[in-house]
Amino acid sequence: MNGKNISNKIIYWYDNNKRFLPWRKKLSKQNREYYTLVSEFMLQQTQVKTVIPYFIKFINKIPSITRLAKVKNETLMRHWQGLGYYSRARNLKKTAIKITKDYNGRLPCSVEELKELPGIGEYTSKAIMAIAFNKKIIPLDGNVERILKRVFYLRKEEEISKEYLNGKINFFGTSNRAR
């Protein structure tokens, strides 16, 4: 079985089993960017089912990147309360301030520029590119890693390093099906 066949099977499975994620519904471009940014910060080290109700409340209280950049720290922490890892909230606000100041309130649209923002690393930058900008990029998360290990029968420590797996990720081809 080749990578394209596996990709098609995964997409078919997803189409039939996907769950509703409020940050992936049909949105304006600007809202899609903001919702993706907020959700990716919230999802760092936290399960989707935990994030959903916090995300909905957060977006209702702080509906835009410019509002987030201006929100008082106490208000931000109150809306983040219960999610833990409060450095994520602080970094999210720092990122909003920088985006408002340096990018006119719009997310930068390259992996390299995104990685320069506070709290955004390799995975988050690629996830934002795939979801918010519909780019043909596959971020390496635990699910993709698990599939790669199974497809390539990887067992050795050197075969399961992030660098090695990132080299294998294009086996699946590229798709803009992140949303």
What do these predicted ranges mean?
Residues 4, 13-179:
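Catalytic cores of DNA base-excision repair glycosylases
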Residues 10:
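Non-catalytic nucleic-acid substrate-recognition regions in nucleic-acid-modifying enzymes
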